[in-house]
């Protein structure tokens, strides 16, 4: 079981390195998603500490954005985005930008800025 877990982590790390190399060689945006830990369900803003499984994921990205939403915000169609990791420029993990719109139609609209 533990051996398989380590192999899975190594495969994910290799995939993240390959995606980073692809973005650099083609000078293009590469998007991917990842899951947080169970503690993220109880936090208002996702931070680096919510990715405890394998920190190597964070080492390969140029930027990682957290998607944050309470039940009330979900009913209102509002979501908060924050930088979890950002290689270029200063950032604060707990500073959020609010996004509202109709996500079912794929039309989020920024209603505040960082």
Predicted regions and their residues:
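C-terminal regions of RecA-like/P-loop NTPase motor modules
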Residues: 3, 10-30, 38-114
């Amino acid at each position: 079981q533990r051996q398989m877990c380590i192999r899975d982590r190594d495969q994910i790390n290799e995939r993240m390195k390959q995606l980073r190399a692809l973005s650099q060689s083609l000078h293009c945006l590469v998007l991917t998603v990842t899951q947080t830990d169970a503690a993220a369900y109880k936090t208002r803003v996702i931070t680096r500490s919510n990715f405890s499984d394998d920190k190597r994921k964070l080492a390969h990205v140029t930027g990682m954005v957290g998607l944050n939403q309470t039940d009330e915000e979900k009913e209102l169609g509002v979501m908060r985005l924050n930088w979890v990791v950002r290689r270029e420029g200063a950032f604060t993990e707990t500073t959020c930008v609010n996004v509202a719109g109709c996500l079912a139609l794929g039309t989020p609209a920024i209603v505040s800025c960082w």
